[in-house]
Amino acid sequence: MAVQDEYILVTGGAGYIGSHTVIELINHGYKVIIVDNLCNSCYDAVARVEFIVRKSIKFFKLDLRDKEGLAQIFDTFKIKGVIHFAALKAVGESMKLPLEYYDNNICGTITLLNVMREHRVKTVVFSSSATVYGDATRFDNMIPIPESCPNDPTNPYGKTKYAIENIIKDLHTSDNTWRGAILRYFNPIGAHPSGLLGEDPLGIPNNLLPFLAQVAIGRREKLLVFGDDYDSHDGTPIRDYIHVVDLAKGHIAALNYLNKINNSEGMYREWNLGTGKGSSVFDIYHAFCKEVGKDLPYEVVGRRTGDVLNLTASPNRANSELKWKAELSITDACRDLWKWTIENPFGFQIDNYKWKLFNTLGIMDYKNRLHTICFQDLEVSIANYGALVQAVRYKGRNLVNGFNDFSRYKLKENPFFGATIGRFANRIANGQFEVDGHLYTLCKNENNKTTLHGGNNGFDKQFFLGPIARQYEDYNTLEFILVDKDGNNGFPSDLETLVKYTIKNNSLEIEYKSVIPEYSKLNVTAVNLTNHSYWNLASPNKTIDGTIIKSTTNVYLKVNSETSLPTGDIVEWQNDITKPTKLDPNISFDNCFIVDREASKFCLDTRKYSLKNIVEVIHPSVPVKLVVSTTEPAFQLYTGDGNDICEFQSRSGFCVETGRFINALNNEKWSKQVILRKGEVYGARSKFSLYAQDLEENKHFLDSASYNSGEYY
């Protein structure tokens, strides 16, 4: 019987501190389930966590007060422990909405603890707050604040945290096998050093540095300093600012501490998580301005209700017992926050971008979403599944074959609509290849003779992580990543592949980058990537007959008629397709045309080359021209004669699959196009540009040369 995986359930795992803690959990070998109702966070943070750790994470959109839904998660998965972040958390807001805070924070926790008790899960790390101490300066000897400082929170937020601490304490008193770690954190700041993850407050930021960051990029006019008449060196309040990564690691240290306790034993203990060093508001202001490179505008206003002079931690207990210590400085935090801010000036709120779940009917699974970038003229939709292009709409006209029902993409008859093809596009002879004296046998998924498009579990049938969505002045990007495991379909080595889509008002560019990661046990593999979109300028559910195609090359790889594999010869096409060629039922293509036949130019990463136009396409009745360009040495032109699925029949679309030579890895002269070793980079770029032109321009295109006609297939 297989051993069931154990999970740490993280409530509020899509939030600022929760998401950073999930990263540290996974980096320390834990499997994680996130539960979050997304009321003051968004799923994009989870997608970015997955991108950073290169692993899929189970996620459930759920309010903790939903006992039935929460219990179902505990029924389904083996939960080993819980890290509890989920809470409303704004001090000022809690003064205005006390009932909402008590209901959400306390009632949600009680429901969680009840479900845990019913499922015999008795390990909880609670993300509390230094606000439970209230104004510690009312005592002469309590700064820095020790855990023994009397508790007297001054606002509803702090009172909910203190109430939850006592609930967990009383639970342990009633059953001493419970293990509760109470982490009283001070002021988290900073962002993940990758620049991919940071605090993204919905609305006006409540915390100092996020607000200051928005001032720095022009989203806010000035910083509001709440009081400069405190008894401090510059009159502003003092706080213990801790880098969010250090804070996240403190939660791992607490969890590890609890896990070392014997199963029959329990404990309840509070720890401060802070640096032990206090900084005033102006200290932080000047540190951040130094990182930005200029002074930022600010205005001193009145004190904020509930604020106190000094909240500096004494972290000695955590240092000694948890073997944890804050290592990162204020400078580190300001640097990481500024990187996050300039790379994500609007956080996760991206103009021209929206997404929705893209699942089989009745299933709610966040690992597959449909991401749409929409400009005035061009709208492109891309799914996590296969990083596939589901729709390309230019001036309201859809130009590619695709399904609105996700389940159809999983049909056996699906001819790879819109998919990213990998790890190796097109055919591999005999389903095998040899490198460094080792023969690798692959999945033979075409007539049990050849490997086609990477095998039965190619990139087209896997869920890519991400995307990282970004906006720029006149374009948007979506970056997806996939980790293809060593041995999948027989291919050696782990492989990390980044697919980056760049969408402008009239173009879709696709960039590929693949590397063998350092952790891979093997150090060589074969790679050839492409996109398998079927284009139809007239109408995606009609035939492409009447479409006019013009290529910049007329040479192709001659193939064996029985195997569809290259003979090794590069020959001229029997009719000149560098002249406009009108498609009709007698003109069919499934051939690899050569853009660059010079072996001296073969390389793994072609991104350094300029894009070359390779194909122009029009339809006489449609005022649109498609131009395909690439850095690649070849492209497969396919007219989709064998397609027959749902509303899409034979010849419902044509493909221009840019890439390397067919079966290049089994040809000594061509193999360096596709053999990737650890430390090297495979890369490629292709672009699909769309132009509006009137029908008279189409006529000129046709008149530029007499178009070909004849039987090509």
Swiss-Prot record:
Q: Which InterPro entries match?
A: Ald1_epimerase_CS (IPR018052), Aldose_1/G6P_1-epimerase (IPR008183), Epimerase_deHydtase (IPR001509), Gal_mutarotase_sf_dom (IPR011013), Galactose_mutarotase-like (IPR047215), GH-type_carb-bd (IPR014718), NAD(P)-bd_dom_sf (IPR036291), UDP_G4E (IPR005886)
Please name the GO terms of the biological process aspect recorded for this protein, alphabetically: galactose metabolic process; monosaccharide metabolic process; UDP-galactose biosynthetic process
An annotated GO cellular component: cytosol
Q: Which cofactor does it need?
A: NAD(+)
Return the annotated region ranges for Mutarotase.
351-713
* One Pfam assignment: Aldose_epim
Report which reactions are catalysed by this protein.
Answer: UDP-alpha-D-glucose = UDP-alpha-D-galactose; alpha-D-glucose = beta-D-glucose
- Stretch list, region Galactowaldenase: 1-350
Q: What class of enzyme is it?
A: isomerase
Molecular functions per Gene Ontology: aldose 1-epimerase activity; carbohydrate binding; UDP-glucose 4-epimerase activity
Q: What is its EC number?
A: 5.1.3.2, 5.1.3.3
Pathway in which the depicted protein is active: Carbohydrate metabolism; galactose metabolism; Carbohydrate metabolism; hexose metabolism
The active-site annotation reads H532
Tell me where the signal peptide lies: none
Q: Which residues bind NAD(+)?
A: 7-38
Keyword annotations for this protein? Carbohydrate metabolism, Galactose metabolism, Isomerase, Multifunctional enzyme, NAD
**What is this protein's function?**
Mutarotase converts alpha-aldose to the beta-anomer. It is active on D-glucose, L-arabinose, D-xylose, D-galactose, maltose and lactose.
Q: Which family does it belong to?
A: In the N-terminal section; belongs to the NAD(P)-dependent epimerase/dehydratase family.
Q: What is this protein called?
A: Bifunctional protein gal10
Name the gene for this chain. gal10
